[in-house]
């Protein structure tokens, strides 16, 4: 483990960055053509650094870049002089100070972990006790779009090896089912994550899941199907569809 005297946080820098999105990113609660994010860099006394990023999406989480920058302006000074290896305690303090700013905290926590691992010269998985480093299957997100555009986007990613598609849904049950069915018919061996971004009612989500089941689609997860406080509906959806729910 790196000497604690060399792992003291001496500087926290942050700056806004606009990241153009190739295709409009449309979800049930809004759309975006530019990601208005914030980068964070934490520097240690030995010159080691770590990076993090805040990616607020106001239509989903209520945060925007301005609120992130405001939160960072208050949180950053509290990290100066602290040991980066005390990231757990620092994260707890930040959560207490800014409970409604998870994107801003995420940027700082990621930078803390990055700097801590670089300082200790270990990978992140080792820090957290991971032992299995086999390749994993990941997904690619397809925004809400016309059926033709959806198929075009998915086909491009399919040709690059993706077989698990996280589909943004939640605005039109019948249209959502048709979009997924078109991919199911055209791209063999795929499966879906249905990401509603809180756009469905309980009844609509049940209908969506049933529609996918009827054409033989494989739904491995439903993400944010209903409003975040409707725990009863989430439990009912999990119970009645048999599909895991993440929120």
Where are these regions (language model features)?
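N-terminal capping/lid subdomain adjacent to the active-site entrance of alpha/beta enzymes
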Residues: 2-192, 197-206, 210-213, 240
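Active-site loop segments of alpha/beta catalytic cores
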Residues: 201-247
